[in-house]
Amino acid sequence: MRPVVSTGKAWCCTVLSAFGVVILSVIAHLFNTNHESFVGSINDPEDGPAYVIFSYLFRRYPFTISYISPPY
């Protein structure tokens, strides 16, 4: 069975994925600590840790959360 992509391209994807995990972890940490650059403006969320948890759940379970309707 032949590989789908070459070894070099597979390593490139692995490195890019690891870099993305690091960047997203830093952003999540800044929201979680209520850093001023992320939650200090008028239009930014007031509760940083709650925003991080909701973002994680939406990323992890997108179809489950998308079916929850707001109360009217």
UniProtKB/Swiss-Prot annotation:
It comes from the Eukaryota. Pfam families: V-ATPase_su_f. One of its GO terms (cellular component) is membrane. Completely overlaps YPR170W-B. Disulfide bonds: none annotated. The keyword RNA-binding does not apply. Keywords: Membrane, Transmembrane, Transmembrane helix. It is found in: Membrane. It comes from Saccharomyces cerevisiae (strain ATCC 204508 / S288c). The chain crosses the membrane at residues 11-31. Its main location: membrane. InterPro entries: Ribonucl_Kappa. It is a single-pass membrane protein. This is Putative uncharacterized protein YPR169W-A.
